[in-house]
Amino acid sequence: MNNKILIVSANYYREISRNLELGASNTLKENGFEYEVINVPGCFEIPYLIKKNINNYNGFISLGCIIKGDTYHFEVIANETTRKIMDLSVDFNIPIGFGVLTCYNLEQAIIRSDINQKNKGQEAALACIQLLK
């Protein structure tokens, strides 16, 4: 494998995820990395797809958006998704750039996914690249 990265991106809040994908893919291209993108329904499914492909890539980038609602669902999805992604990275000794937004409102998500502002997809890609060096 020649530094091939898998971007796993959640379709929930698709416009946000699309911008995160753009930030990540541009960064990977600029740094000479090959990559593929697989979309999953939501953030909770990201760890499954990473585990399923753990032996096929040099690193992963997890992208998605979780926005707080009126129930405990936000905490469950945010905490369990984050924990399992970290577990996979440590247990399999493989870099996983974390670009799953956990926001209190849509405005925060828009800012953090804006390609011209704080694009967290770009930051997740840079983290993965740095860990591969």
Predicted regions and their residues:
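Active-site rim loops that border cofactor/substrate pockets in soluble metabolic enzymes
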Residues: 25-56
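Glycine-rich phosphate-binding loop
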Residues: 48-85
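A charged, well-structured terminal subsegment
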Residues: 118-133
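Glycine-rich phosphate/diphosphate-binding loop of Rossmann-like nucleotide-binding domains
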Residues: 2-37
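Short, ordered loop/turn segments at secondary-structure junctions
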Residues: 11-12, 65-66, 101-105
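Short, acidic/small-residue loops that bind anionic groups at enzyme active sites
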Residues: 75-102
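Phosphate-binding/catalytic loops
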Residues: 104-119
